Structures are given as structure tokens and as C-alpha cells.
Amino acid sequence: MAIYTKLNHQNIQLLANDYDLKIIEFSPLDGGSGNSSYLLKDEVNSYVLTVCDDKRLEEVTKLGQLLLLLKSYNVPCNRLIKTVNGEILTTYTISKSIKPVILKYFIEGQVVKKLNESMLIQVGRKVAQLNKIPSPDYLPKNHPYGRHFFSKALGLAIDNRYESWLSEEIVYLDNKIIPNLPCGLIHGDLFYDNLLFKQSLNKPISFKAIIDFEEACNYYLVFELGMAIVGCCSNDITIDLKKARAFVHGYQQVRKLKDIEKESLQLFVHYAAVATSYWRFNKYNIEEPRKDMIGHHWQMVELSKEVFKISTTRFFDAIFNSD
């Protein structure tokens, strides 16, 4: 990932002064799109300092507020550090641009691309814990790359076949998503690389944390499950229904799904794949064009089609019915 804002030791220490820290070592981290992150170390702890290149102060303040809220509910996630003045963020000014900066404790853990069923049960429990937290008023009511934004990709003549397909998906989803589905606080981007695990000597691997809450919103709770199944239970071609079953099983140990959510889950797995295709198309063809990623959205198009092909009875039985 690109480092948008390049900081030297002097820059780092000036920012660290706002937290009364003396930094002895730092290095850039691979970060999410739209921000620049650095691993900092002092004599005691390790930290992650993030310069939010593409977000406004208001957005980052809300993210900080959310992280503080999650801490109060003991959700295993990034722990925000306030400045010595009690502020959620500080700022870095470059070329007359003021960029928000946040500091979090570094979480030691590993990303696992291929999650097994035991790991997915653990993830399901923690995601359900998150989804039971009352959603704060400051979170958006639409998902940042949900269907309400799909029309932004239409009429651009960048990929006519994709744009035509997406226009049909907008109509399909608008007609199929039923009213009165439960909404609440969701992470919104539960792919495997937003989960950390801990491997201890002579012990099974255990869940450590959920990270990167930039897409958090007050949205359909079943969308959270759909995205997690796409992001953690697929093999790039289709969904592994045994893994999806394990995730949902763990989830329901903490939060029981309503019947309308169970009946809508397959639709929302499909929806999550469509939404991810839109994110990739928008990211790599419009916002940050990359020749090597220009067709990356098609993988999610094909996944969404494979989910659609599964009979509703087979999908429901595989996820919810006892053997």
C-alpha cells in the first residue's frame, strides 16, 4: 500500500509530543487505502500512528468516538489513545493541508487468510457481541459502499458490461430487500485481513481482535453476516457453506437471528459480493486507477453469481438445519 504522507523522525516526534511520548524507533506500515500508518515504539509500548489522508476531521473524530465506545463494551479492537489535552486526535499540516492524526496501541497478532471452522466460530461470537451494542447517533445510516452509492459507477463507459450488470443489480436488490430488517452497529468490512489471531506455543490459534472500523455504520445487521461470509468463507470462486455455517453458528451463540434475517441471509451474501465489486471498480478504475487491478471487480461479480445459483433450500439447510 502507498504511504501518502511521508514522515521523518522529527515529524514523528513532534506529533508524539502531543501524547507525551518519547519515540525511539519508527517504521511505515502497510495501511488501508487513504491513510498513512507508522509503527512507533518507546521504552514501554508500541503504537500505531495514522495520518488520515482522505478523511475530514469530523469523520476521524467520529471514528475515535466509536473506538472509545467499543472499549467501554470490551470489544477486542484497536484502543485509541487521547492526547495529553484529552483530544481524540491531533493534526499534521503539510502544503497548507491539515490532516487528522490518531494514535492507537499496537495489537500484536497475525492475519490468517484461510480461516478454519473453529476460528470462524470465534469470529462469529465476537461479531455478534459487536452487533448487540446500541448504535451511536453519529454513525451513517447507509453503508459506505452499499447499494445507495452504486449509481455513481453508471454511465461512465469505463466497463460497459459491468455498468450494465450493476444497473440490473440495483433494481434487483431494491425489489428483494424486505422492510423491517433489524439494523444496528456493524463493522461493515469483515474481510479476513481485518481480523487478528494469536498463535501460542502448544495452544490452538485464538481470536485476538477486529481492526479497521472506517466503514462502520448503522445498517442491516444481516449485511454484516453477508460481508463476513464473502470476506472470510469464500474460496475466490464460491462460498464454502461449511465455513459459513460455522461462522453463523458462533454468531447465534451470542445473538439469535430473527426468521426474516435467516431468510434474507443468502440475498445479503449476494449483496455483499456486489457491494465489494462496486468498491473495487470505484477504487481501481476511478479514485486510484491501477492497470494491474482494473478488472479486479469481476472476481466479486462471479462470486455473486455463484451465490445466486445456489438453491434457497440448499443454502438454508446448509447454514441453519441440523445434520
Where do the language-model regions lie?
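Active-site activation/catalytic loop segments of kinase-like enzymes and analogous catalytic loops
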Residues: 222-256, 271-287
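All-alpha amphipathic helical-bundle segments outside canonical DNA-binding/catalytic cores
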Residues: 259-269
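Conserved NTP-binding catalytic cores of kinases and kinase-like/nucleotidyltransferase enzymes
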Residues: 1-84, 198-205, 320-323
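Active-site acidic catalytic loop and adjacent metal/ATP-binding pocket
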Residues: 35-41, 48-49, 80, 171-223
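Short Pro/Gly-enriched beta-strand edge/turn motifs at strand-loop
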Residues: 17-24, 168-179
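ATP-binding pocket architecture of kinase catalytic cores
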Residues: 42-137
